């Protein structure tokens, strides 16, 4: 289509401009994929590919059928990972999967007209936690105790349509849960008081680093650390 070809032409003619768009999205999203929250990994070597691309939340093709030009709308642009589909990213043994059912984010979404049925990452309220996770599998589930009722259907659709329970993502989330468990167990073994240690852990895990980036799978850590996480986020005026 004309819309898709214009995007390709923009990238070819203006590589610096496209790079600047990516860098701004990277800053706006604190270094995380807008859908799965894996860290955005830029290429380390010449033969690597950035695990990062620009996604149009409302598909570019929608511009052809509606008055709004989604193609050029900054608020329609998201920075996302390759969803496990790109073998030439850094850390491919961790980030790439040859199996179709292990692909996530905008890979299964494609140009399907589902934008009205899933959560728009730019409009998710920062003040509430929408998801919880199974501690022994890393599986993502809508948290009915904290996710607003009006968002629960969209939240479920988001997990399903973007395949956010791909085995690859569950494995990564489980790795973070294990790290948090180990940190807590080590602290307790060293004589720490849980109520004093957990706020410190929440602060170290949930606040942005010196580059303004969040830890990957931020929402997993937020869920795992419970009220200690919410207290730290409130104190620091969290609004992702």
What are these regions (language model features)?
Residues 2-5:
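Short, small-residue-biased leader/transition segments that mark boundaries at the very start
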Residues 19-29, 70-73:
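Short, flexible, mixed-charge glycine/proline-rich loop motifs
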Residues 39-50, 164-165, 169, 206:
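Hydrophobic N-terminal alpha-helices or hydrophobic patches in metabolic proteins across all domains
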Residues 40-104:
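Histidine-centered nuclease catalytic patch
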Residues 95-150, 158-165:
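Long, low-complexity, intrinsically disordered segments enriched in glycines and aromatic residues
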Residues 141-240:
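C-terminal, charged low-complexity interaction regions
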């Amino acid at each position: 289509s004309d819309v898709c070809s214009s995007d390709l032409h923009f990238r070819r003619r203006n590589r610096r401009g496209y790079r600047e768009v990516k860098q701004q999205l990277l800053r706006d999203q604190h270094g995380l994929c807008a859908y799965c929250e894996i860290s955005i990994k830029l290429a380390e070597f010449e033969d690597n590919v950035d695990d990062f691309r620009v996604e149009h939340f409302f598909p570019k093709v929608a511009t052809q059928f509606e008055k709004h030009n989604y193609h050029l709308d900054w608020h329609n642009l998201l920075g996302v990972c390759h969803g496990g589909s790109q073998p030439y990213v850094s850390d491919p043994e961790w980030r790439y999967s040859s199996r179709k059912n292990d692909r996530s984010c905008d890979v299964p979404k494609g140009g399907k007209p589902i934008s009205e049925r899933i959560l728009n990452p730019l409009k998710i309220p920062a003040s509430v936690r929408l998801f919880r996770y199974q501690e022994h599998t890393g599986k993502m589930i809508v948290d009915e105790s904290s996710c607003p009722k009006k968002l629960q259907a969209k939240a479920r659709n988001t997990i399903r349509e973007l395949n956010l329970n791909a085995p690859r993502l569950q494995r990564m989330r489980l790795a973070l849960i294990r790290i948090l468990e180990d940190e807590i167990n080590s602290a307790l073994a060293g004589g720490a008081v849980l109520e004093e240690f957990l706020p410190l852990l929440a602060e170290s895990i949930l606040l942005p680093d010196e580059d303004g980036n969040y830890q990957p799978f931020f929402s997993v850590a937020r869920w795992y650390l419970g009220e200690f996480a919410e207290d730290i986020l409130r104190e620091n005026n969290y609004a992702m």
